[in-house]
Amino acid sequence: MPVVYVNIFLAFIVSLTGLLIYRSHLMSSLLCLEGMMLSLFVMLTVTVLNNHFTLANMAPIILLVFAACEAALGLSLLVMVSNTYGTDYVQNLNLLQC
């Protein structure tokens, strides 16, 4: 396995670990999700370019579009929670809370 793949995989693992550890604030969770999506995008792009997958050339762009939509929805949720509760705690997103 080349060093590039190992580095990208480690970036994904670090982002996943950050998501599991720092899950109290919504902003830190969103940043970790963006790190995961970025590492997946780079891994997919490197794989497509190295293996000359001509049919999968659009896959990294589609993943990037989904990442942008996820970021926009996450930021709108962050603004809504911040305006409603005054903080960005993830526990405020619990729908069973009254």
From Swiss-Prot:
It is a multi-pass membrane protein. Its main location: mitochondrion. One of its GO terms (biological process) is ATP synthesis coupled electron transport. One of its GO terms (molecular function) is NADH dehydrogenase (ubiquinone) activity. Pfam families: Oxidored_q2 (PF00420). The chain crosses the membrane at residues 1-21, 29-49, 61-81. It catalyses: a ubiquinone + NADH + 5 H(+)(in) = a ubiquinol + NAD(+) + 4 H(+)(out). Keywords: Electron transport, Membrane, Mitochondrion, Mitochondrion inner membrane, NAD, Respiratory chain, Translocase, Transmembrane, Transmembrane helix, Transport, Ubiquinone. It comes from the Eukaryota. Its EC number is 7.1.1.2. The keyword Translocase applies. Belongs to the complex I subunit 4L family. Core subunit of the mitochondrial membrane respiratory chain NADH dehydrogenase (Complex I) which catalyzes electron transfer from NADH through the respiratory chain, using ubiquinone as an electron acceptor. Part of the enzyme membrane arm which is embedded in the lipid bilayer and involved in proton translocation. Core subunit of respiratory chain NADH dehydrogenase (Complex I) which is composed of 45 different subunits. PANTHER family: NADH-UBIQUINONE OXIDOREDUCTASE CHAIN 4L, NADH-UBIQUINONE OXIDOREDUCTASE SUBUNIT ND4L. This is NADH-ubiquinone oxidoreductase chain 4L. The lineage of its organism: Eukaryota, Metazoa, Chordata, Craniata, Vertebrata.
